[in-house]
Amino acid sequence: MRTHYCGHLNREHIGQTVTLCGWAHRRRDHGGVIFIDLRDREGMAQIVIDPDTPEAFKIAESVRNEFVLKVVCKVRARPEGTVNLNIPTGEVEMLASEIEILNPSLTPPFMLDDDNLSEMVRLEHRYIDLRRPAMQKNLMLRYRVAKVLRDQLDSQGFIEVETPMLTRSTPEGARDYLVPSRVHHGQFFALPQSPQLFKQLLMVSGFDRYFQITKCFRDEDLRADRQPEFTQVDIETSFLNEEEIMTIVEGMIRTMFKQVQDIDLPNPFPRISFAEAMNRYGSDKPDMRVTLEITELTDVMKDVDFKVFAGAANSAGGRVAAIRVPNGAALSRSEIDAYTEFVKIYGAKGLAYIKVNDASKLNEEGLQSPIVKNIHEPALKAIIERTGAQSGDIVFFGADKAKIVNEALGALRTKIGHEKGHVDGRAWAPLWVVDFPMFEHDEENDRWVALHHPFTSPKDGHEDLLASNPGAALSKAYDMVLNGWEVGGGSVRIHKQEVQSKVFDALKISKEEAQEKFGFLLDALQYGAPPHGGLAFGLDRLVTLMAGAESIRDVIAFPKTQRAQCLMTKAPNEVDEKQLRELHIRVRQQNPAA
């Protein structure tokens, strides 16, 4: 039907007769000559229709935006003064001899070049939204990323194996999406949150190197970087330690960035421990482009008169820390108030600060803040020296439980860093975070929970801590972070049943519960399971970063909203009563007063 894509035509095609198919992006009448910008996925071509071809001219007069056209035309150079070097086809235009309307179009709900569209309108008419060049560029980037990753894995001996979409529910983290069984009354499948257990079983089966680009499902509260269904590049290997796995994966990502976007990532990626990341940056996924750091002050605040600081410094699990912002003394009261409200999102009760007007004067004359009079001089000296504060700076403080301080100051560090230009100028800052704790403490239920998942292996020499001091046990886990986003996470897995049982004991998972939920894995570990480990990448997150998109919804063809709805298909929806009866399900009506 066509001989060329619109966006592929250039000076080399001058004199050729070509057939193009696409959508009328824009139609213009100029002094008896009609111009149509014809668009397909590869770009735009300018079609010229003059009265010398009366039949084509008559049809062109009736063309409106988004009509689907087939055009036979001759490629010629654009007249002098009309060349547009901003587009690949800008040196040529196409003189039409024949036009056929393959399908007319209603007036679209929005113009494709409207940059102020409501996302709700875009998602409701996604099939129109996906015609926008920016969206097509994003999805083609996604395809190229997936293809290069697949080719890289194939070249290194990885085998692509599909794992089940219908599996059993083992709710340890987020809620499962449940699928009722019609055949087995009262029983349910679950959609997988990850292929974790199946890929471990493939290693037990001897496949050695596995990968899969697969959908995963989590029924959780949504954020800008979350979707109820998401795509994961899933990898598992046998007989490799964490260093070898990280080397393979890092090389794969470095090659992919180079091939897809001609970006040179550092070799090797920097590494820091989880403890260092939390202490210095308040996050296990720090944006290393931001130059601000968190400074520890707990030890010097134990005997100050300011009770907020002293209370946190003397309480078990408390922390007092600070961020110095160069030239921050110029911040207005309203800006400081806005930052105070921001940290409250993370549980902070407020945001103390000191404006450093004169760093040489450790009193209220040199340091401007209501809290200065309640902090003795040795502590003030420690604040200035440890943070490196200079005249004209501001120092923000966090004082609370360490978890709250880390999250609040970590988020504030990133926010101020980007808003006030405290970044180092790098476009890309990859990082490995290693030496994660095995567990974190759930204070509400007074129990340990797995920081990653319960199948992560403890570091060598930490196995005995599983029973004696679970909070001190470190794991063979590693996360790849890029510009403050966790794009990949993995670990060496437990391959011995007795070690897996010790982890379940630390998590207060009884032998009966472990056998009920994970009996198939525990059984498999008794039949010569090899040492194994792996990693999974969030493809959506990775492409979002590479595309410079604001949300992962911009790199997914048909995403859900933040309320987990598809506005286009109106999913989820009510189903027929007959379908529910076949599944032995009754919908209980919600009581608005309840």
From Swiss-Prot:
<dbReference type="InterPro" id="IPR029351">
    <property type="entry name" value="GAD_dom"/>
</dbReference>
<dbReference type="InterPro" id="IPR004364">
    <property type="entry name" value="Aa-tRNA-synt_II"/>
</dbReference>
<dbReference type="GO" id="GO:0006422">
    <property type="term" value="P:aspartyl-tRNA aminoacylation"/>
</dbReference>
<dbReference type="GO" id="GO:0004815">
    <property type="term" value="F:aspartate-tRNA ligase activity"/>
</dbReference>
<feature type="binding site">
    <location>
        <position position="486"/>
    </location>
    <ligand>
        <name>ATP</name>
    </ligand>
</feature>
<dbReference type="Pfam" id="PF00152">
    <property type="entry name" value="tRNA-synt_2"/>
</dbReference>
<keyword id="KW-0030">Aminoacyl-tRNA synthetase</keyword>
<dbReference type="GO" id="GO:0050560">
    <property type="term" value="F:aspartate-tRNA(Asn) ligase activity"/>
</dbReference>
<dbReference type="Pfam" id="PF02938">
    <property type="entry name" value="GAD"/>
</dbReference>
<dbReference type="InterPro" id="IPR004115">
    <property type="entry name" value="GAD-like_sf"/>
</dbReference>
<keyword id="KW-0963">Cytoplasm</keyword>
<keyword id="KW-0436">Ligase</keyword>
<feature type="site" description="Important for tRNA non-discrimination">
    <location>
        <position position="30"/>
    </location>
</feature>
<dbReference type="GO" id="GO:0005524">
    <property type="term" value="F:ATP binding"/>
</dbReference>
<feature type="binding site">
    <location>
        <position position="172"/>
    </location>
    <ligand>
        <name>L-aspartate</name>
    </ligand>
</feature>
<feature type="binding site">
    <location>
        <position position="493"/>
    </location>
    <ligand>
        <name>L-aspartate</name>
    </ligand>
</feature>
<dbReference type="GO" id="GO:0005737">
    <property type="term" value="C:cytoplasm"/>
</dbReference>
<feature type="binding site">
    <location>
        <position position="227"/>
    </location>
    <ligand>
        <name>ATP</name>
    </ligand>
</feature>
<feature type="binding site">
    <location>
        <position position="452"/>
    </location>
    <ligand>
        <name>L-aspartate</name>
    </ligand>
</feature>
<comment type="subunit">
    <text>Homodimer.</text>
</comment>
<protein>
    <recommendedName>
        <fullName>Aspartate--tRNA(Asp/Asn) ligase</fullName>
        <ecNumber>6.1.1.23</ecNumber>
    </recommendedName>
</protein>
<keyword id="KW-0648">Protein biosynthesis</keyword>
<dbReference type="InterPro" id="IPR047089">
    <property type="entry name" value="Asp-tRNA-ligase_1_N"/>
</dbReference>
<dbReference type="GO" id="GO:0003676">
    <property type="term" value="F:nucleic acid binding"/>
</dbReference>
<dbReference type="InterPro" id="IPR006195">
    <property type="entry name" value="aa-tRNA-synth_II"/>
</dbReference>
<comment type="function">
    <text>Aspartyl-tRNA synthetase with relaxed tRNA specificity since it is able to aspartylate not only its cognate tRNA(Asp) but also tRNA(Asn). Reaction proceeds in two steps: L-aspartate is first activated by ATP to form Asp-AMP and then transferred to the acceptor end of tRNA(Asp/Asn).</text>
</comment>
<dbReference type="InterPro" id="IPR045864">
    <property type="entry name" value="aa-tRNA-synth_II/BPL/LPL"/>
</dbReference>
<feature type="region of interest" description="Aspartate">
    <location>
        <begin position="196"/>
        <end position="199"/>
    </location>
</feature>
<dbReference type="InterPro" id="IPR012340">
    <property type="entry name" value="NA-bd_OB-fold"/>
</dbReference>
<dbReference type="InterPro" id="IPR002312">
    <property type="entry name" value="Asp/Asn-tRNA-synth_IIb"/>
</dbReference>
<feature type="site" description="Important for tRNA non-discrimination">
    <location>
        <position position="81"/>
    </location>
</feature>
<keyword id="KW-0547">Nucleotide-binding</keyword>
<comment type="similarity">
    <text>Belongs to the class-II aminoacyl-tRNA synthetase family. Type 1 subfamily.</text>
</comment>
<dbReference type="InterPro" id="IPR047090">
    <property type="entry name" value="AspRS_core"/>
</dbReference>
<dbReference type="InterPro" id="IPR004365">
    <property type="entry name" value="NA-bd_OB_tRNA"/>
</dbReference>
<keyword id="KW-0067">ATP-binding</keyword>
<dbReference type="Pfam" id="PF01336">
    <property type="entry name" value="tRNA_anti-codon"/>
</dbReference>
<feature type="binding site">
    <location>
        <position position="218"/>
    </location>
    <ligand>
        <name>L-aspartate</name>
    </ligand>
</feature>
<feature type="binding site">
    <location>
        <begin position="218"/>
        <end position="220"/>
    </location>
    <ligand>
        <name>ATP</name>
    </ligand>
</feature>
<feature type="binding site">
    <location>
        <begin position="538"/>
        <end position="541"/>
    </location>
    <ligand>
        <name>ATP</name>
    </ligand>
</feature>
<dbReference type="InterPro" id="IPR004524">
    <property type="entry name" value="Asp-tRNA-ligase_1"/>
</dbReference>
